[in-house]
Amino acid sequence: MLFRSDVRGEQLAALETECHALLTSPKVSRLIERAQASADSLEDWQIANLREMRRQRDHSLAMPNALISRLAKATARAEVHWAEARRNRRYADVAPFLAEVVALTRDRAALLGQHLGLDPYDALLDEYSPGVLTGALDPLFKTLGRRLPSMVQESLTLQMAAPPLPIEGRFAPSRQRALCVEAMKALGFPFDRGRLDESEHSFTEGITGDLRVTTHFEPADPFHGLLAALHETGHALYQLGLPPEWRDQPVGRSRGLALEESQSLLLEMCVVRSRPFLTFLKPMIDRHLGGSGAAWEVDNLYRLLTRVHASPLRIDADELTYLAHVLLRCDLERQLISGKLAAADLSEAWNSLAEVRLGIRPQSDAEGVLQDDHWAVGQFAYFPAHALGGLIAMQLWEAIRNEVEDLDGAIARGDFSTLNQWLRTNVHGVGARSDVQALVKDATG
């Protein structure tokens, strides 16, 4: 397997360097400048498209081919070792490979920051959340970090009056998958243009006509895989809703990870975990999982899926502690990029900070530092977008509830057409034409 990862790394490096060579060629720069000189004659979407082309070119110019090639190979190796380390529940198995990725990412951040006139971490952040910098995030995250503990404690106190009954039993992955597929279809995922598979960590990849959603099933927890699959369905619906007339153009792509995450979190946290959706889902749950008794009633399922609880796993977190999970990762990755934290010490740093942020210490590396693959594949400055995405999701949801009549009734009936149309019109169909701030303001007032 390790040999295959090296081969895959070579292939990815070849593709990355070829794309880089095309973007940084003098011909592309000449064409961009020629188009810029004629900007007065361009339509609005073409001006936005040119802006995105220039942005891609500028980011590419900062990177030498050799660094791109080394990073592609390093992340391919680290990803394979991460999967093995997670299975073995032993961070030491991936630590040296992650250290290589971190070192190369530091070099990349420094070069990118120098070229763009940004702090190294801000330069990485700008890739995932264009226009959003730490100067704006730090006060927001500081406020969240200060207020979250009391909000969590208040919720825990309120829950004590009516704690949810646990779901007991074991549920075959095939039955869980069937439930996921039926729910995804109802929400609008087209299985003639995509599919659902299993993986160590859930993700969504692909293009508009071929979207791949994955999830991970736990036999003792039938809602673990379901919530992950429907979270990823939010990502997929966003990709499907991007403007078809601008397909394959930079302006027709995602506006950034914060907006993408807002769509997955809106679907999972606001729609799927709601009482109306669980009312709609209940017959499917009965059909595929076969549960019976008070624990399987809608009221209990609602309390179960909305309860605030300390979990070491981000993917199992509720809407309050999810933000604490994200802040933990933001703290650690900034230390990694700045050089204040060595990759070799990451596991202990994670466990110690988890006690502060989450009030719980992971029992193993698998439920601690190894639960996400993002850093192994080089995705640094990715997690701040999760926090922003959660906040954007709440803003959009409030606007939707104000504008869509009988939203709860429609969801309970399994009618998601009006909801999906609102999102396509106000979010998905905008593509990268507007920046995130302008898009959210236009959508919410």
Give names to the regions the model predicted.
Residues M1-P130, R433-D435:
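A well-structured
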Residues V7, L67-R70, F97-E100, L140, ...:
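Secondary-structure capping and boundary motifs in well-ordered enzyme cores
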Residues V7, V326, C330-T444:
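C-terminal, non-catalytic "cap/extension" segments appended to globular domains
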Residues A66, L71-P222:
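Contiguous, non-catalytic segments that form substrate-binding/exosite surfaces or channel walls
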Residues G113, F217, D221-P244, E261-E268, ...:
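Active-site recognition of the HExxH zinc-binding catalytic motif
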Residues F141, G145-L148, P173-A178, A183-D197, ...:
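All-alpha helical catalytic cores of prenyl diphosphate-utilizing isoprenoid enzymes
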Residues R253-A294:
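Post-HExxH zinc-binding segment in Zn-dependent metallohydrolases
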